[in-house]
Amino acid sequence: MARQPRLDAPGALHHIIGRGIERTNIFRTDQDRDDFLNRLANQCLEKNIVVYAWSLLSNHFHLLVRTGRYPLSEVMKKLLTGYVVNFNLRHKRTGHLFQNRYKSIICEDDPYLLELTRYIHLNPLRAGLVGSLKELGYYRWSGHSAIM
């Protein structure tokens, strides 16, 4: 059965989730995380997208983005393909890294935007990567620390 095409429109708000195959780590080192975030920042500039929230955990990531004039699929293809190529070179491996294709859910601006931003930014706390909200304020791999 063929996959349904993704819903997208210029200016759409998307909650994006990407997971490692069999929940394996897609971020092994800080260099991996830095590479992913640098690539995301480049896509923001090149493709005119806005990132409202992001969180990188060891085996998955969450993004909350508003697309610009380019389709989300074009943005994510460049982000994820470039990331996987470098990840595989760094870690001397081959093959796929992500489980299936990324999940994207179109969201309404109000009232869901604020709630979803909170959900994404609190993910490291719920996962036990940090022990408190105060520690989350210093956690480099979530947008929470960038806006606090």
How would you name each of these model-derived features?
Residues M1-M148:
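Short catalytic/metal-binding and nucleic-acid-binding patches
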